[in-house]
């Protein structure tokens, strides 16, 4: 079964050379309405042929093209007969592989720059931020490079320059090969979206087929084709990903879906009641409510290592699903909310340079002998795309745009060993923090906010007595892409109010601190 529109028919291939911004390129292309995939640079020619892209983008990267062992694009990229767009490192390796030269620079260019367009091409057609005195177009861009192209291939022309970068953009119009030394995918490059859009839609000739309505239609058709008349079991947490999966499956197979809501003791305050009310009472899904707090906490007893805790929680979920599936006669499929960044992070490059940043319980840690097949309808989607189709499916905005919550829940927000006492205290403290953020109209002004339980006691004075009670840390960050983040400068009066409420209303907590660490060097979550 297929949809009336093949939404994968026109597509862009992005080869990843390791830039922290590479996923942004893919997200920008999806926002334009075109499907794309992100692969490691060391892909085989046969795989590119099979994918048959309308165009290829070579990403930036941290290494130097001048190094003997530095990554190179497969030569077939330049023989495939499709447009190629090199970004930063991608432009440098393209230039060198096609006969140009790259050299290290005595002056590293990092930050804002103004690029002067010196040669009219289809690549920058009608795209500029300002006009120079000589009539040339000017672009405000974001640079991040040390090396630079010092000689271009003989069949290329110089398109743009800066005072310190003689080849800020290059082009071979006949072959539709283009390169820029700046990063169009970041918001700091003001016309970046238009540059990418022009390449994808006009130069590569792609259509805007990748829309929320088409994605939903395609996902439903694929689910029906994959599972047939079998029953499917889904772990419903109430988070964005599992909620959207539940709605897609419900539309596709109706009552053949059984959602298992596992109350593992690691959820937010009143989350269980909210999930059952929304999906059971309002949307009419078939939900099995499993109360497994003791099971999870017993499995976590004595464990302090964050990665080990993630694996324990993941295995416990799978065990519960296996048990529940045995009660369903035809349950042969386990649905999961795996999304595209999970897949990217968990995929190791063939050359061994890639590594798993954090294990995702949706992708890693699954037992080899798991008895069910996997259904992952969101596997191709970024989080912003998941939210958009969630709205299209009728889920409420405030649920879809809630701050991120880790899959292992409070299991990684209670530092060290996880105990029921710690979780109960953390739940109440966190609820106060989030409630006050909403009351002060600050919730949507920060990207993520939560409370962390610290397993240390601190002296406090309550009434006439001294007592030793626990410490919690408030964490709030501002970020565009969650790759880097700044700590949120919340008002002192606000922080004081939250601290007073937590200490006065949550018996067992004597001290509240505020985390002012950025990412990097710290990560957003503590574990």
Curated annotation (Swiss-Prot):
Keyword presence, S-adenosyl-L-methionine: no
Record Pfam families: GATase, GMP_synt_C, NAD_synthase
Record-level Gene Ontology MF annotations: ATP binding; GMP synthase activity
Pathway membership, UniProt: Purine metabolism; GMP biosynthesis; GMP from XMP (L-Gln route): step 1/1
Catalytic activity reported: XMP + L-glutamine + ATP + H2O = GMP + L-glutamate + AMP + diphosphate + 2 H(+)
Primary enzyme class: ligase
Gene3D superfamilies: 3.30.300.10, 3.40.50.880, HUPs (3.40.50.620)
Coiled-coil residues: none
EC number in record: 6.3.5.2
Residue ranges annotated for the Glutamine amidotransferase type-1 domain, each copy included: 11-209
Binding-site list for ATP: 237-243
Keyword vocabulary terms for this entry: ATP-binding, Glutamine amidotransferase, GMP biosynthesis, Ligase, Nucleotide-binding, Purine biosynthesis
Active site per the UniProt annotation: 88 (nucleophile), 183, 185
Keyword Nucleotide-binding: yes
Residue intervals of the GMPS ATP-PPase domain: 210-402
CDD domains from the UniProt entry: GATase1_GMP_Synthase, GMP_synthase_C
Gene Ontology cellular component terms for the protein in this record: cytosol
PANTHER family: GMP SYNTHASE [GLUTAMINE-HYDROLYZING] (PTHR11922:SF2), GMP SYNTHASE-RELATED (PTHR11922)
Subunit relationships: Homodimer.
Stated role: Catalyzes the synthesis of GMP from XMP.
Protein name listed in UniProt: GMP synthase [glutamine-hydrolyzing]
Organism: Photobacterium profundum (strain SS9)
